[in-house]
Amino acid sequence: MTHDIAKFSAAAWQAAHLAGKIIRAAWHQPRSIDYKGPIDLVTSTDRAAEHTIIKVLQRELPSHSILAEEQSEITGVASDYRWVIDPLDGTTNFAHAYPQVAVSIALEFSRQIILGLVYDPLRRECFRAVKGQGATLNDERIRISAVDKLDQALLATGFPYDRRDNADFYLRF
């Protein structure tokens, strides 16, 4: 099947860009923080960014389904397309004014990711990848490192919220 990747990518960028404006506007403001779990935060900025993303995607692609972090599943009209949204990836960082946050949006077709967009609104960097077409940073092609040995590579990671329940698993890394 041929996908209208240009249209989908443009909608994702428009949604991420508007959500990024919300995040930047809130950056130096007091934060309203709620807890979904002991270490799982949500802010009014998460909710506002998510609302904006959903609004854009529903307007541009009304038949698509949406899975959003704060609102759960919003189903379109029997679509094989589903957007997966984290409106403020790095909420804990945002809550502590640590400048490592992003808007993350992906598009699935029949449960296969075909498009991903990660926008850092503080640096105004937009990473985009399309299945089978590679990845870009601000529309310039990027490539992976040529290093092929793990002990010579630079690695960075974060640990998920279940890290306490699965400490043995994560310590093996």
Give the residues covered by each predicted segment.
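N-terminal subdomain of lithium-sensitive/metallo-dependent phosphomonoesterases centered on the IMPase/IPPase/PAP
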Residues: 1-88
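Short loop/turn motifs at secondary-structure junctions and domain boundaries
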Residues: 75-78, 97, 109-111, 119
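Conserved structural elements of the adenylate-forming
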Residues: 98-102
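Acidic beta-strand-loop-alpha-helix segment within the catalytic core
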Residues: 106-173
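Glycine/small-residue-rich loop that forms an oxyanion/phosphate-binding "nest" at active or ligand-binding sites
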Residues: 82, 94, 105
